[in-house]
Amino acid sequence: MNQQYSAMRSNVSMLGKLLGDTIKEALGEDILDKVETIRKLSKSSRAGNEAHRQQLLSTLQNLSNNELLPVARAFNQFLNLTNVAEQYHSISPHGEAASNPVALAKLFTRLKEKNFNNGDLKKAVNELSIELVLTAHPTEIARRTLIHKLVAVNTCLSQLDHDDLADYERNNIMRRLRQLVAQSWHTDEIRKIRPTPIDEAKWGFAMVENSLWEGVPAFLREFNEQLEESIDYSLPVEAVPVRFTSWMGGDRDGNPNVTAEVTRHVLLLSRWKAADLFLKDIQVLVSELSMSECTPEVRKLAGGDEILEPYREIAKKLRTQLSNTLTYLEKQLKGEQVLPPTDLLVDNEQLWQPLYACYQSLKTCGMEIIANGQLLDILRRIRCFGLSLVRIDVRQESTRHTTAISELTQYLELGDYASWSEEEKQAFLLYELHSKRPLIPHNWQPSAETQEVFATCKVIAESPQDAIAAYVISMAKAPSDVLAVHLLLKEAGCPFTLPVAPLFETLDDLNNAENIIQQLMNIQWYRELIHDKQMVMIGYSDSAKDAGVMAAAWAQYRAQDALINVCEKEGITLTLFHGRGGTIGRGGAPAHAALLSQPPGSLKGGLRVTEQGEMIRFKFGLPQVTISSLALYASAILEANLLPPPEPKPEWHQVMDTLSDVSCKMYRDYVREQPDFVPYFRAATPEQELAKLPLGSRPAKRHPAGGVESLRAIPWIFAWTQNRLMLPAWLGAGAALQQVVNDGKQDVLAEMCRDWPFFTTRIGMLEMVFAKADLWLAEYYDHRLVDKNLWPLGQKLRKQLSADIKTVLAISKDEHLMADLPWIAESIALRNVYTDPLNVLQVELLLRSRQQQYSDPQVEQALMVTIAGIAAGMRNTG
């Protein structure tokens, strides 16, 4: 094992020992001995010792009800600490960061070798746009209070990572680590109540405050240094290529808990938090900017010649304005009726202009080193976060708009809008969009659902323009779906044009996306409205649930390609918004690989992508990790735009068409046509029990009485991740690949794997899933939990998985899974030792829970802990 991994393993070992000491202190030697025995048996079982595997099973099966919870908690906490050690390893100078310098430096070297001139590079840098959308359905299982403790553990690991520590310093850090591990152990890791949408929004704001606020300026500083070194170019102060948006408090698709009032509250809360953070920043400037020499502009802003410390005076004025803004927003949040103060900050320019004048003045007066300190960081925060902190997207399902307009047209005795043809809908909508009179009568009393749709549009209309980023229409199926939202916003009196993004998420809708956008582009009124800019969202999770990963991936690729072509032809700047999840079954892939695997030209309009639940913490949970993640994104976008992958050959297209058709048919044959599938799914996974876990504010099902088709993509994936079959992430794909091999096209597949990033990524993602899947554990779930009549189905699926692994290895020409990514393989192996006992224990708990007439709180709690622990072990939930 090389030196890099040994540093991580020694951290894991140290944290494990501290946890062991804590358990011993809290519960005594016997429980610790039991936990240690289970851990050693698990390690030996993983190494292939069958006798120890049987011993592991019997030990866990025979735990008393009193032992269940401590054992489950021990392994859950082991995994949380392992993940911290792994996250630290990725940024440690003695770990992954030692051999993986910031990706940008390597890219600039490659571009120079390919004779790119600096002008091309500067243009690409100036056009760089990364918008990360923090989503509103956190699959983040860990409670916020525990996350704070784990972040503090990471800080301790960083402090220990020095060779020159004095003994007393090391002792102090170790004492702090022991305290943090003990605090975590004595804290209940499972939420007792579901978070509200406002709780979720606060979670997002905490992520900004604790990590992104420091991480973004630090990344831009690093990025700027790389640019100066490589191409002698400095990033303009006003150019901030990174922005953050949130769905928390704005995404009402299928979530009745997100109301117009909730959105209004979250928008106020967001502005309050921004004012609070900027106030702290400005306070630093008040204490630091004591210089007197300045330009006439700054002298005038400060209040004239008699002001001795002009920069400090300007900072003090801003401090007063921010303080007044904070007080006003606090009163509004409490529901008090209050008039806005005359110096209320509502526009980013109010903050930007005086500070930018100070920046220019300091540079002009020879104090560039001071200008480029804290002041520059604040200016960049204004451009990235602004007075809204994070903008929000509003998302709603298309049928809600149709129903609202239909209710209105029937009240006005114009007929039933919902039953009209697409042509009739468009004609009506365009007529009303051109009309100068209002459509909605003042005395009309709509239904509560329709009133909610109108109220949401009113909240948008009354918000500062920079507070709302876009209106996303889920399940968009026709041009009228887009026009309908524009009409609703017009009727609400929205004073600005909000980008409206149709979301195409089923196989049929993806295939029809080009046609819908082309129809919209043919409407003259629409063309004038959008100023040659269109956003389209591609849904990854629902398409994969609908058709399987291979067919969904190809439909997404083809839809993007077609949309790029239609927008290019029409002279439209297209922004593709990717609705990816953290898991493979929901489109997740390592960021760099995922971006390079998209169609050529897909990133010209910038990148807009959702960051889901627990992935937000893994990618952006610490300032240093934020720097690495943003550098990866920036590098991948620049590479994709400057060194686009070659257009795929027609033969590759044909092979993908075959793979898509064959895999989709097999996937649907199982999931939709196989009568035993739903009973098997419900028995072999903790799907029913998952509903009890207070995960996010959104219900697990769109329709409570429905089957698999009504399940949201997150619990669908989550359930299969728990029993280690990982079915949604591979079903159909391997069988389709084998069929193409049988058709004599193995050489073509090898060529695609070698030369086409899209296909290389598909194979790589399958390998990662196969590395996390586990045949014996999946079989164990079946034999203990599933009716014998359903065993043949499970057997068939496992046999298919086994065959698929061989097929993929034959195509990639690797001897074992993840051969190209030893670091990820190492990480999976490290966590398996702790995850396996949780899987075995979960089976036992499911069995006891399902057999009991009355629920036992200890069993229920232990079951929830195993669910959380396996999620931590798999590093994926939904």
Swiss-Prot record:
InterPro entries named among the record's database cross-references: PEP_COase, PEP_COase_bac/pln-type, PEP_COase_Lys_AS, PEPCASE_His_AS, Pyrv/PenolPyrv_kinase-like_dom
Active site: 137, 545
Sequence intervals crossing the membrane: none
Keywords: Carbon dioxide fixation, Lyase, Magnesium
PROSITE patterns registered for this protein in UniProt: PEPCASE_1, PEPCASE_2
Gene Ontology process terms (BP): carbon fixation; oxaloacetate metabolic process; tricarboxylic acid cycle
MF-aspect GO terms: magnesium ion binding; phosphoenolpyruvate carboxylase activity
Taxonomy, superkingdom: Bacteria
Reaction catalysis annotation: oxaloacetate + phosphate = phosphoenolpyruvate + hydrogencarbonate
Enzyme class per UniProt: lyase
Pfam families on file: PEPcase
GO cellular component terms listed in the entry, alphabetical order: cytosol
Enzyme Commission number(s): 4.1.1.31
Required cofactor(s): Mg(2+)
Family per record: Belongs to the PEPCase type 1 family.
Function per UniProt: Forms oxaloacetate, a four-carbon dicarboxylic acid source for the tricarboxylic acid cycle.
Protein known as: Phosphoenolpyruvate carboxylase
